[in-house]
């Protein structure tokens, strides 16, 4: 007999996930469920699945599964929505929510409009720039001169791209170029995602600098394909802008689904991401 599973669909600038309250619902095969519900024709339709669970180290724990069923370390847009979900559903009714992820505990400061949660600023932690910890395969010299992977030429299917590699808890390859709207991402995105340089695969951001305070990007997400937005990707692009001398530490990142404000704090080395969080609808899914 089919069992009704209660869910809420939420989105952060178009990056949409199905959220399930793990305090109340039991999910035995989350990867398989993610594949089914993410299908935009035969399921609910989403970029993946997020489980909100009890935590021993934070207010809640989130597990995030991509549309292909693979589990990811975290998602910046999703963690904002987790903060809103936790507040709206009375799991924790306070302005600052701590969320345990596979990339560490994230601090989510909720933003309110007319008494309702409309978004959040998230402390995304410090960017990881050491190639081995991103991870990206490269030779590291003894004098430390190869401790960052910045604007390095990489052959991808016979074409050279300058890649800057950053981890925001998950791996990112950032490429700066003109004409990002003309890119055939479904064709070239998988070539980066599965490139042997990245042993855990990678998210790939194609970024176009508009000014010292604004940059546009498109993203090919590991396990999900092209999405309207990627929070950790926007953070990686902002960090890469600074590393390449293209922008300052406060930058607006414009994605297909909307814009995020990213601040890379020089004193703490932490990256802060600010953006919206929206509930789309709730319902029951039968399994």
Curated annotation (Swiss-Prot):
It comes from the Bacteria. The record marks 172, 221 as: Could be important to modulate the pK values of the two catalytic cysteine residues. This is Diaminopimelate epimerase. SUPFAM superfamilies: Diaminopimelate epimerase-like. Its EC number is 5.1.1.7. Gene3D superfamilies: Diaminopimelate Epimerase, Chain A, domain 1 (3.10.310.10). Substrate binds at residues 15, 66, 76-77, 170, 203, 221-222, 231-232. Belongs to the diaminopimelate epimerase family. The active site is at 75 (proton donor), 230 (proton acceptor). It is found in: Cytoplasm. It catalyses: (2S,6S)-2,6-diaminopimelate = meso-2,6-diaminopimelate. Catalyzes the stereoinversion of LL-2,6-diaminopimelate (L,L-DAP) to meso-diaminopimelate (meso-DAP), a precursor of L-lysine and an essential component of the bacterial peptidoglycan. It comes from Desulfovibrio desulfuricans (strain ATCC 27774 / DSM 6949 / MB). One of its GO terms (biological process) is lysine biosynthetic process via diaminopimelate. Pathway: Amino-acid biosynthesis; L-lysine biosynthesis via DAP pathway; DL-2,6-diaminopimelate from LL-2,6-diaminopimelate: step 1/1. InterPro entries: DAP_epimerase_AS, DAP_epimerase_DapF. One of its GO terms (molecular function) is diaminopimelate epimerase activity. Homodimer. Keywords: Amino-acid biosynthesis, Cytoplasm, Isomerase, Lysine biosynthesis. The gene is dapF. It holds the Pfam family DAP_epimerase. GO terms for cellular component: cytosol. Its main location: cytoplasm.
